[in-house]
Curated annotation (Swiss-Prot):
SUPFAM superfamilies: Globin-like. (2R,3E)-phycocyanobilin binds at C85. The keyword Transport applies. Light-harvesting photosynthetic bile pigment-protein from the phycobiliprotein complex (phycobilisome, PBS). Phycocyanin is the major phycobiliprotein in the PBS rod. GO terms for biological process: photosynthesis. Heterodimer of an alpha and a beta subunit, which further assembles into trimers and the trimers into hexamers. Its main location: membrane. It is a peripheral membrane protein. The keyword Nucleus does not apply. This is C-phycocyanin-2 alpha subunit. The gene is cpcA2. InterPro entries: Globin-like_sf, Phycobilisome_asu/bsu, Phycobilisome_asu/bsu_sf, Phycocyanin_a. Keywords: Antenna complex, Bile pigment, Chromophore, Electron transport, Membrane, Photosynthesis, Phycobilisome, Thylakoid, Transport.
Length: 163
């Protein structure tokens, strides 16, 4: 079983032959509330993925116009290049939803950030493009309250890792 604050609290209480304390139960309640917010955010982001990805790609093209005028496989000067850009932005968004469901940065760290520098150098991709895309998603996802806070925490984590 993987260790989490909840499993550690249960293990500690069990080893001491006691029920969970009020404080431990409050932590558990808070984690479940956070999980519900994360799941709601993941669902909303997934439902709006197409419009968020397209808007984010256009934000990248606006801020970095050379991406649509520079020829080559790694730029958005062709329909194929634009499709690759949208695919990559969609991947970033998908990983954010995985983190929301998992309740931690593990999916971001393991599926995205591990080896990302190598990929970006190999394919001449600029992290600043994805930072701009993520900023657009954060500003336009339409979430509110705890769901917004949960989503923004993972988007900010990713932006900081790319910056």
């Amino acid at each position: 079983m993987s260790k989490t604050p909840l499993t550690e609290a249960v293990a500690a209480a069990d080893s001491q032959g006691r029920f969970l304390s009020s404080a431990e139960l409050q932590v558990a309640f808070g984690r479940f509330r956070q999980a519900a917010s994360g799941l709601a955010a993941a669902k909303a982001l997934a439902n709006n993925a197409d419009s968020l990805v397209n808007g984010a790609a256009n934000a990248v093209y606006s801020k970095f116009p050379y991406t649509t005028s520079t020829p080559g496989n790694n730029f958005a000067s062709t329909p194929e290049g634009k499709a690759k850009c949208a695919r990559d932005i969609g991947y970033y968004l998908r990983i954010v939803t995985y983190a929301l469901v998992a309740g931690g940065t593990g999916p971001i760290d393991e599926y995205l950030l591990a080896g990302l520098d190598e990929i970006n150098k190999t394919f001449d991709l600029a992290p600043s493009w994805y930072v701009e895309a993520l900023k657009y998603i954060k500003a336009n996802h339409g979430l509110s309250g705890d769901s917004r806070d949960e989503a923004n925490s993972y988007i900010d984590y990713l932006i900081n890792a790319l910056s």
